[in-house]
Structures are given as C-alpha cells and as structure tokens.
C-alpha cells in the first residue's frame, strides 16, 4: 500500500487527560446541594470563593456598596485600645451608645446598674435594743453541779481545769434524771445550740461510773457508745470526754472515724477503752469486722448516745443506725459484774431541732423515753428558736454585688476590731457557703490575691502579711493580722483536723488576730468553737434547721454574738416571713449600699492591680496615685474589677471561679421542697450571679460533668454519613494527587 492510500487521524489531548478520568470517576453523591457542589469544584481543581472578614481594617476588607459610613465604622471599631475599652466598659457597660467592640473582647457589666429592684422597704420584725435580754443558753446563777448529783471529783475538775462553775438549763434538767434513772427509761434531749448538750449526757455517765465501788480500768470494757454524724463533731466529743476523764486517768476514751487508719484503731480497741466515740460508718465497720469490740461491749455497755439526730437522718444514716442497734442488742449483757450500772441498755437521742427524720429515728431507737427540753411550747409543739442574746442581721443584696458586699462586711468587722485596741483577744468569724468548690474560690480570692501571704498549716490556713491590699482598711505600715481558713468535706481528714485545731486554739499564733473561716455546713453541727463573734451566711441554708445550727456557732453559753444573712432581691425576700417564728427577738434589716459598702469604701482609695493609670492622675506626674480619694462606689467597682482581672489573667483562679459558680448553681437547686418557692433556680439571673464569682460571662459548659481534675470530659461522637462521605472524598482526592498513583 502506498503512502497516498493511508488514512491519518489527528487527536487533540489535554495535558491533564490522565488525571481527568480519575476525577470523573470520583462522583460525589449524598448531602446538601451546596456541599456536593463545593466538593465537586474542589475535586476539579477549582477554587472556592471565600467570604471576606468583616473586621478587616484595610481597604481590601471593605464590602463594596457600603459607602463611606462603613469605612468610618470599621476604623471606629479598631480605634479603641485595650485599656480604653476596659475603662469604658467599667464605667457604663450597659449602654454602648451604638459603638461595637471587637468580637474577641469581653463585655464588662456595671455593678450598680440593671439590678433587680428590692421590694422590702419596711422591717416587719424589728429588733428592739431597749428590751432587756436574758441569755437563753447561759449557765444558771443559783445552781451548782454538786446539787445535781455530780461527784465531787468531777465538780472540782470542772471548776479548776475547765472553768465551768454553773450548769445550763438543759444540764439542770437532764443530769439528775439520767443519774437516777437506773435503766428504766430512754431519753430524748432537745435544747438550743450552744446550751451544753454534750455535758448533759457525759457528766451523768461518768458520775455513775465513778460512784461504783468496783475497780475500773481500760480493760473493764466500754460503758458508753456515742455516735455523731460528722468526723469533726465526733472528734470534739472525744476531746471533751478526754478532758473530763483526765481527773481519773484509768478511764480511756477511743475515737473511731473515717479517714484514719483502721489498723491503729484496732490496736487501741485491743488495749481496751471505756468510751467508744465515732461516726456511724466506721463504728458499723468495726462491729462487723473487729472481734475485740464485741468483747469490749459485752462486759459493760450500758449507754448508747445518738448525738445530732437530725443530721444523722439527713445524711442518710438511718439504715446504718438500725444495723448498729441490732448488732448491739444481739450482744448479751453481763449485769453481774457491775451491779450498780443500769440493768439494761439506756438509749439517748440528742437534737437541737425537731424534724420528721428525728421523729423516725426516735421511733426506731427509743422506747419508753422521757423528753427533756428547754424549748418553747407553741400549739402543743416544741419550737426551737435562736438564742435571745443573738443579734440577727439580714441584708438583701443583688447577685452582682454579693462578693464585694462580703468583702465590705469582713472589712468592717476587721476595722472595728483594730479600732477597739483589744490586741490581747482573738476575733473569729465564720462564713458559710453552699459547696466545697465555692469555699475554694472564696478562700483563694481573699487570701491569694497579691502574693502577700504565707501558709501556716498546709494550704488550708493562710496568714495575710504586710503589703496585702485585700481589705481597704489595711495599711502598708502594719501587719493586717488576718488569718484565712477553709474547711469542707473534700479535704483530707488530717487537714480538716489541723485546720479546726488551729482555728479554735488561743496561742501566740492567733493572739490579736481576726480569724476568718470559709466553710460548708460541715462546721455547722455541734462544734463548740470558742469566741466566735460573727457568723455570715453568704448562701442561705438548705433548710431552716440548718439556719439555726449555723447561727448557733456564735452566742454560745450566754455570750453575745452576731449573725448576717444574705438574700437576693425577689422571691428570697419572702424567706424572712418564713424564719420569723425562729427569731422572737427580731432582727436588723441592713441596706447593702449605705450601711455596708459605704462605710467600707468611703474615704479610702482602692488602686487597680494592673499598670493602668487614670487620665486625671497622668496630669500630675509628681503626685502619688494613692493620695487621691474617689467615691465609694468607684472604689467598690475598682475592687471588683481587680478580682475580674485576676480571673482573666490567672487560668488556675479562673478554673476555681468556674467550678465554684457551676457547683453553686447545682447546690442552689437542692433546697427542700417546702422552700422551693423562695429558692428556685429558675429565678436566678445566671449572668449576674457569675459576676459575683469574678466571671464576665456565664460559663458555656454549665451542663457538662466535670472530672476530678477540673477538665470536662466529652464522649466521642459517632461519625454521621455525611461526614464519612466527605472524609472518603478527601481520601480519594489525596490518592489521586499522590505521586505513586499510576
């Protein structure tokens, strides 16, 4: 065939012919139309147009068609420096006047604006200062312990060593009846907090033992089993009992509480003891697993005491108590060895309040009991009231101002203590909050602000040192003489014990100082802390019984005391009518601004904790910043902004603030049903409440459960079909672009 007969074919090929077949093969299906189109364009090598950023300050960031006003607005948004923004937001945050701050900046609200109106204008339960007050829980003047049947050895020991000369009203009623009972009846002891219920059952038990002619030592067995709801109360009863029996060294008490080594407790039980004092869980554990404790109880046990019965039931120990009583009743009692002791077990139940739980426990533990009470009778019921010598105060504070009002209250107490010149005495103040995370936040907020402090006992006790600026009354020329404590159930038992001992001890370390303890209700029951001048309830109690126990930490044994209750505007104001029957002597209703904040922040200057200087201070270079005095509301705002700036700059402190706020809201939702009409989480303004924890906005992780280390844990989400399709498409595109794809 010649060349002329041949046929020539011309083919036009693109440069990416090889790759196009693969790209066409990767067909995108499923999902939305926009997603399919975007993925198809990406596979074809086309670029996807992106939206321009609206906050770009250059000319290329301006959206066409908006005109000159858009350019001016963009330049105006970016013209504020960070210092001017914070100054502007602090002055008038609720009115932006049309100006828009950058998206990454935080909104700082004003303390004194947009607060809920306080409707209570008149105090309906006024405290009359002209009425003569007789302390309701004070020792009686005309009575002696000897006339009640207490042995002379104990009477002299009480007067010389413990400095107790007169019995209280409940002790006068209880001691003779328990001594002369001979095992016929059980007893229900009901009295006010701070009236001496512990001695009302310990003194007759020890007196009965000392009146026996039989020789007694630690090997004679346990005569009494005392059960308390908390470790702190059990430890206090143990120390009181140890002090009482120090006059007769052959009587030995034993403490059984959680957090201690069981091996050491078993060793003490093997050596022998005459009084077993402990918490329900640990006592039941030893009754079930320690053989020697049953041997101790079978020889001499005659008394079972349940102290703070309402708290035992509130903490859910009803089944534990029933098991303990059942085991003890199954132990045979040998009454021939000590014939002068009661021939059967005597049960005693002690409580400062009468609740449904106490009534259930009374039906389980007591039989043929006698009621011993010094409460007032009303409509055939016994009503427990606060001590007559207690000065109760109530203040209604908006949620945003809770923290700065608390600081002003503590400042006023400290300032009055310094002005009194009583350097030889020790002043104690207890601040009750709702949860342990809130304790941690307030403890660090008031003790770790500027580094001028030192730890005294681990990390739970801090002494404020010279140069500290937490309270406006502090001066650079002298030591603050303020010690901050924290106490809650999440601390280790050793730290809880050492903290309480340091707070209650009168020595050179606490002499002339103001001791402030932030705590939960773990310190509200039964603890006899000496010379507590004031009790502050920053968070209202979960039940009115807890309120009586809280205020009972002060005004004990006839001494004067003060208590301050914080309430929020709105529904919580009606709580005053609810607690009015428990305060027959009335209360003082304080205005938070004029009577608390103004005395604390007036005639002082609170400096900022950053390097920013006001414009009026820049004009005078030689003038000291601290020489100029500002209005009290400006000082209060500056103080609170210092806390907020610390939250922003310190991640660890911010974590404490977030955890404290979230735990506080969760705890607020646990009020009993009868009080939900006053304390309902739906009534809270969460944004305003977050500001009282130094937060400039409500945390977004409110519903997430937090792990123990504070990090929120999220479960991995399952991949849906659309995301899986995109992932497979990306893998196909990557495979096509690979150099190994032939």
Curated annotation (Swiss-Prot):
User: What Pfam families would the database entry show?
Assistant: CTE_SPB4 (PF13959), DEAD (PF00270), Helicase_C (PF00271)
Q: Which family does it belong to?
A: Belongs to the DEAD box helicase family. DDX31/DBP7 subfamily.
What is this protein called in UniProt? ATP-dependent RNA helicase DBP7
GO MF entries: ATP binding; ATP hydrolysis activity; RNA binding; RNA helicase activity
Task: List, for all copies, the residue spans of the domain called Helicase C-terminal.
Answer: 405-605
- How are the domains described in the entry? The Q motif is unique to and characteristic of the DEAD box family of RNA helicases and controls ATP binding and hydrolysis.
Q: Where in the cell is it found?
A: Nucleus, Nucleolus
Any GO CC annotation of this UniProt entry: nucleolus
**Motif DEAD box: positions:** 307-310
Q: What class of enzyme is it?
A: hydrolase
Keywords, in A-Z order: ATP-binding, Helicase, Hydrolase, Nucleotide-binding, Nucleus, Ribosome biogenesis, RNA-binding, rRNA processing
- Enumerate the spans annotated as Helicase ATP-binding domain: 178-372
Q: Which PROSITE patterns match?
A: HELICASE_ATP_BIND_1, HELICASE_CTER, Q_MOTIF
List, as start-end ranges, the regions of compositional bias called Basic and acidic residues: 710-722
Name the residues that bind ATP: 191-198
Query: Looking at the record's lineage, which domain of life comes first?
Result: Eukaryota
- Record EC number: 3.6.4.13
Show the catalytic activity.
Answer: ATP + H2O = ADP + phosphate + H(+)
Region feature (Disordered): 45-100, 701-726
Span of the annotated motif Q motif? 143-172
Give the UniProt record's GO annotations in the biological process aspect: rRNA processing
Q: SMART domains, from UniProt? A: DEXDc, DUF4217, HELICc
Q: What does this protein do?
A: ATP-binding RNA helicase involved in the biogenesis of 60S ribosomal subunits and is required for the normal formation of 25S and 5.8S rRNAs.
């Amino acid at each position: 065939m010649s060349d002329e007969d041949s046929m020539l074919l011309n083919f036009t090929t693109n440069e990416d012919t090889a790759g196009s077949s693969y790209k066409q093969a990767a067909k995108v299906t499923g999902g939305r139309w926009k997603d399919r189109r975007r993925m198809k364009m990406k596979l074809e090598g086309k670029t996807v147009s992106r939206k321009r950023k609206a906050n770009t300050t250059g000319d290329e960031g301006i959206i066409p068609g908006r005109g000159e006003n858009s350019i001016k607005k963009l330049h105006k948004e970016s013209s504020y420096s960070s210092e001017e923004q914070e100054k502007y937001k602090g002055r008038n945050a609720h009115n932006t006047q049309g100006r828009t701050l950058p998206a990454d900046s935080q909104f700082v609200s004003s303390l004194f604006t947009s607060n809920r109106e306080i409707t209570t204008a008149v105090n309906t339960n006024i405290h009359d200062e002209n009425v003569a007050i007789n302390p309701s829980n004070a020792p009686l003047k005309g009575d002696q312990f000897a006339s009640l049947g207490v042995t002379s050895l104990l009477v002299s020991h009480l007067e010389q060593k413990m400095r107790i000369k007169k019995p209280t009203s409940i002790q006068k009623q209880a001691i003779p009846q328990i001594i002369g009972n001979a095992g016929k009846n059980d007893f229900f002891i009901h009295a006010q907090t701070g009236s001496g219920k512990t001695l009302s059952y310990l003194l007759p038990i020890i007196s009965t033992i000392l009146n026996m002619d039989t020789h007694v030592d630690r090997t004679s067995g346990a005569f009494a089993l005392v059960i308390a709801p908390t470790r702190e109360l059990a430890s206090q009863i143990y120390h009181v009992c140890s002090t009482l029996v120090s006059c007769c060294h052959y009587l030995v008490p034993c403490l059984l509480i959680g957090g201690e080594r069981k091996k050491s407790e078993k060793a003490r039980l093997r050596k022998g003891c005459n009084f077993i004092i402990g918490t329900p869980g640990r006592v039941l554990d030893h009754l079930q697993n320690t053989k020697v404790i049953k041997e101790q109880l079978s020889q001499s046990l005659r008394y079972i005491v349940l102290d703070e019965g309402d708290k035992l039931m509130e903490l859910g120990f009803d089944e534990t108590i029933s098991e303990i009583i059942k085991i003890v009743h199954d132990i045979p009692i040998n009454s021939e060895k000590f014939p002068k002791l009661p021939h059967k077990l005597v049960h005693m139940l002690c409580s400062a309040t009468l609740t449904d739980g106490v009534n259930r426990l009374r039906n389980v533990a007591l039989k043929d009991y006698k009621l011993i009470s010094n409460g007032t009778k009303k409509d055939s019921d016994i009503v427990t009231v606060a001590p007559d010598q207690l000065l109760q105060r109530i203040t209604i504070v908006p949620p945003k101002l809770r923290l700065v009002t608390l600081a002003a209250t503590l400042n006023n107490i400290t300032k009055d203590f310094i002005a009194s010149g009583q350097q030889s005495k020790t002043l104690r103040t207890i601040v009750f909050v709702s949860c342990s995370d809130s304790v941690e936040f307030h403890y660090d907020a008031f003790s770790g602000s500027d580094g001028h402090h030192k730890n005294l006992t681990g990390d739970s006790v801090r002494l404020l040192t010279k140069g500290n600026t937490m309270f406006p009354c502090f001066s650079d020329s002298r030591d603050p003489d303020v010690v901050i404590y924290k106490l809650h159930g999440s601390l280790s038992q050793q730290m809880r014990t050492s903290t309480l001992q340091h707070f209650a001890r009168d020595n050179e370390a606490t002499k002339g100082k103001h001791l402030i303890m932030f705590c939960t209700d773990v310190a509200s029951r039964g603890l006899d802390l000496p010379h507590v001048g004031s009790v502050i309830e920053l968070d209202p109690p979960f039940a009115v019984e807890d309120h009586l126990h809280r205020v009972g930490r002060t005004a004990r044994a006839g001494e004067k005391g003060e208590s301050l209750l914080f309430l929020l505007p709105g529904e919580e104001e009606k709580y005053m009518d609810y607690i009015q029957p428990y305060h027959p002597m009335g209360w003082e209703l304080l205005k938070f601004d004029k009577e608390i904040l103004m005395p604390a922040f007036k005639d002082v200057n609170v400096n900022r904790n950053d390097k920013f200087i006001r414009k009026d201070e820049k004009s005078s270079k030689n003038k000291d910043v601290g020489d100029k005095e500002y209005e009290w509301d400006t000082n209060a705002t500056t103080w609170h902004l210092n806390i907020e700036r610390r939250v922003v700059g310190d991640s660890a402190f911010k974590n404490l603030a977030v955890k404290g706020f979230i735990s506080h809201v969760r705890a607020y939702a646990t009020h009993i049903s009868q009080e939900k009409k006053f304390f309902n989480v739906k009534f809270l303004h969460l944004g305003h409440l977050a500001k009282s924890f130094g937060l400039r906005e409500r945390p977004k992780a409110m519903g997430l459960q937090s792990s123990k280390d504070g990090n929120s844990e999220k479960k991995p989400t399952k991949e849906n079909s659309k995301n899986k399709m995109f992932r497979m498409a990306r893998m196909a595109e990557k495979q096509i672009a690979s150099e190994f794809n032939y």
